[in-house]
Amino acid sequence: MSGIGRRRFMVGVSGAAGVLAAGFGVAGTAGSRSPAQSGEHEEKADARAVSTSELSTFFATAMVGNAVEVDSESDGDLWVTCWADDDNLYSVNGDGSGFADGPRHDIVVNRISGDPKSGFTGEVLAVADEVGAIWGDPAHYNRKPTGIVCVDGRLYLAIQDLRLGPGDIAFNDAPAASVSWSDDHGRTWHKTQQPMFTGGVFTTVFFLDFGRDSGYAATALGADAGRYVYAYGLDGNWRGSFTATVADPFDLYLARAPKEAVEQRNRWEFFAGLDGDTPRWSKQLTDRRAVLRDTRRQYPTLRNYREWPHNLSVISQGGVVYVEPLKRYLYTSWTEYTYEFYEAPTPWGPWKLFLTKDFGGYPWFGRGPGCPGPKNGGYATTIPSKFIAADGTSMWVQSNWWVGSAGGDTAYSFNLRKMTLLPYRAQTPANQPDPRDNLAYTGAAVTPIEKSAHFGHTEYYNDGDFTKSENSFDQENKDLDFWGFTWSEPYLMNQVVYTTGEMFDDGGWFAASLRVQVRQDFRWIDVQNTKIEPRYPYTASTGAFTTYTFSFATTSGDGLRIIGKPGGSAYFTSIAELEVYYR
């Protein structure tokens, strides 16, 4: 199947700055006609939630870019990446020509130089049969890279068979996988004689990234455990199987192999649970236990459900990276329309969700003349360890996107967007009353949050410009909508000033239960006895660019949001500005 064919079925994820665990978010800009013009009604979506025991309390704020920020002259997707001993990145793409103008292949090995500031150049080193085998019928399956690691100068590359077709079954099952290896930095590859994993069991494999040449492994785990390469695996498919060809993956598994023998299947051991805090390992695949299980579904219904996927499982092919300054492991997963990011103190957990970034249903917007965005997410989310800041609080996310574009450049290339994470520190609010101090401007590490932002302009509702409008139209008939901020330290507050954005025939206002919430100890708490002036009408008569003031007794928190049931037949709200005061 051609690359275009693959792009039709393989849709991307993410692209604003989301919320869930610690409540992070984003926003964009509204157009003059209804944003739901081509939408199609389906039954109302159920509210989605994760129990508090599964939510992280490690990061006070987290934000990831609304769209691609750094692009490159390359072609392809997936872009599994490692940082090698020679200080280069080695990245393997699927379905493209890589960093070359030549023919397109199902798998391409590239060496990449540069950084997000100076830009990237690359060189193609090997392609197709030079890299790995197709274990099934080549008429029905081709090769896809799922993970790569460098250890002691050797590259190990995990490759799976992924369904080609016919028709809609493409990309919906992955029955076999193996590992190729290179001792000359990617120019020559050696292959196993048979697949290492079959039957759709542990067939999406991605390696734990311990930095340059896996240099942090021994530091993080100790000399003995640091002798191994660690690999995560999914069963069935690399993401949910949109045609139910196989079961959707709900479980993330962990294995390890001696760093000199990753290609030898009989040397692998699988995480089989804990004895106290000590992991147990078994050579028997049947003994394995999941390190993370998440059965949530995103977008259980969709207004344009006949055209695009919905009811999406959240465990997918991404990456796991160790952030040494924070002593934390990050797993970057995704769905068609969201990023799903987790953190843990050890490779085996406990894994907890710290960020859901919701980009809304299609269409998305690329960067280009006349485009209202950009706002776009992507699939196969990874964090190259080479570009993690020295203090561990900023890094760059790679993901890809092709289908569902309303204009502008898509992201079918090696590209990056910035993510910023600030660890939580318990503090006491110390701000003094000041009628002019708008915490939406002056708060520490102020981070906009929302359910979703149609055009990805998260800066609009704390930029002081009351003429710009963002809205939350996202193709979902949602029960709740919100706009707000989180901070890296707590504040006293007693007033919120909300200015609406543009109104549409099918939405733009809150329909019921509009209220203020503050975040305390990572829980969102309703503020009691709030007075709204003027009275909020809960209809289209709310008015475009109209200001409402919420006054309440002094409270404190390291986050604030207005929340309620969205209005109109398309279930969305709008915003121009949100101000927060302690007066």
Regions found by a protein language model. Name each.
Residues 1-17:
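N-terminal secretory signal peptides and thylakoid transit peptides that target proteins
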Residues 54-60, 88-138, 162-173, 185, ...:
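Beta-propeller domains
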Residues 228-345, 358-359, 368-369:
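Active-site cradle of extracellular carbohydrate-active enzymes
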Residues 353-387:
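Conserved blade-ending motifs and adjacent loop-strand segments that build the rim/top face
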Residues 466-528, 544-583:
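Aromatic, loop-rich ligand-recognition surfaces of beta-strand-rich domains
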